[in-house]
Amino acid sequence: VIVATPTGSTAYSLAAGGPILDSQTKGVVVTPICPHSLASPAMVFAQERKLNICVGQVADDEVFISCDGAAGYPLKAGATAEVRLSDQVVKLITFGKADQFQAIDQKLRSRR
């Protein structure tokens, strides 16, 4: 699964079929990666939620947890990873008028 903030919702999560979260949303989206079912929608959770992602019984495959494409950390069958939003905030610099949806529209149009 992909766990993304509003900023991350326009990247890998969007490519996996997840929704775009408004930049003012206080929460995260959890998007399945390549689900075997069409009935596996992304889910949005409030910022106060602590999410426990549990690794089931794994056959020959390994499960990794990674942050923003960094090197992964292996998780064993039965392991649980707790995911929650930090109280710390990162301020992003934008030049000119920042319009999240105009920027997304330009990104999507350039990929056609």
Please annotate each region the language model reported.
Residues 1-4:
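AMP-binding/adenylate-forming core of the ANL superfamily
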Residues 10-112:
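Catalytic phosphate-donor-binding core of small-molecule kinases
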Residues 7:
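Single, functionally critical "micro-switch" positions that shape active/binding sites
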